[in-house]
C-alpha cells in the first residue's frame, strides 16, 4: 500500500483529477508549465510546487513525462499536484495549441544562443515549455515555441536540471507581474490625486 518505511497512518481511495488540455489552458491564468519528456519524478514534483507558488494555474504533462501522481512526484510537489490543474495530455502539440487559444505565449530554455531570461518580458501570460533532463525539447516541439531564453551561469557548471531552471523562470515571471502591477497601482494613485 505504501512505498515508504514509516508511512502516515492514513489511507484513502480517490479518482485522479486529470483535466482536458483545453480546460487546463483556460485555468492557467498568467502562467502555465508544459513538461515534455520530463521523466524524473523529483524534478516534476519540484516544478509543480514552484508553479503553484509562482501563481501558475496549470501544469501539462506531455510526451513521455513522468506520471504526476507517482508517489515521489506527489511528495516532491508538497501537495501542489492537487491544487493546480494537471493534465496528462500526451501530445505537446495539442497542449501548445490549447494554450495559444487561451492567449498564452510560449517560452523555452536553451543552453546558449538566446537572450537572458531577465531581459525578456514574462509579465504577460506565458507557458514555460520544459524538456527532458538529458535531451531538452524534441525538435518538432522546439519549432512551435515562440521564444527561447538562456539562464546565464558562471563556473564550470554545464547546465541546471529542469526543476531548477523551471523554478527560476516561474519566479522571474512572478517578479515581473508584481513589478508591473505595482507600477500600475502607483500610476492609478497618481491619477486619483490629479484635479
Regions found by a protein language model. Name each.
Residues 1, 95-98, 158-163:
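Short, charged, surface-exposed secondary-structure boundary motifs
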Residues 1-4, 22-26, 78, 98, ...:
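Short secondary-structure boundary/capping segments
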Residues 12, 52-54, 68-70, 75-81, ...:
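Structured adenosyl-cofactor binding patch, chiefly the S-adenosyl-L-methionine
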Residues 44, 126, 166-170:
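Alpha-helical structural signal
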Residues 107-157, 161:
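Active-site/ligand-binding-proximal alpha/beta "capping" segment
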Amino acid at each position: 500500500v505504501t512505498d515508504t518505511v514509516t508511512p502516515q497512518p492514513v489511507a484513502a481511495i480517490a479518482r485522479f483529477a486529470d483535466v482536458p488540455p483545453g480546460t487546463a489552458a483556460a485555468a492557467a491564468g498568467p502562467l502555465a508549465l508544459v513538461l515534455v519528456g520530463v521523466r524524473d519524478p523529483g524534478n516534476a514534483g519540484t516544478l509543480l510546487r514552484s508553479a503553484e507558488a509562482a501563481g501558475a494555474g496549470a501544469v501539462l504533462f506531455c510526451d513521455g513525462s513522468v506520471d504526476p501522481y507517482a508517489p515521489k512526484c506527489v511528495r516532491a510537489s508538497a501537495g501542489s499536484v492537487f491544487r493546480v490543474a494537471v493534465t496528462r495530455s500526451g501530445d505537446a502539440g495539442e497542449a501548445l495549441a490549447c494554450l495559444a487559444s487561451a492567449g498564452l505565449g510560449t517560452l523555452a530554455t536553451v543552453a546558449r544562443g538566446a537572450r537572458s531570461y531577465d531581459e525578456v518580458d514574462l509579465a504577460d501570460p506565458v507557458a514555460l515549455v520544459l524538456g527532458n533532463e538529458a535531451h531538452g525539447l524534441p525538435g518538432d516541439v522546439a519549432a512551435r515555441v515562440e521564444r527561447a531564453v538562456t539562464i546565464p551561469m558562471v563556473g564550470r557548471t554545464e547546465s541546471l536540471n529542469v526543476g531548477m531552471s523551471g523554478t527560476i523562470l516561474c519566479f522571474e515571471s512572478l517578479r515581473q507581474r508584481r513589478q508591473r502591477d505595482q507600477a500600475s497601482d502607483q500610476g492609478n494613485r497618481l491619477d486619483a490625486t490629479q484635479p
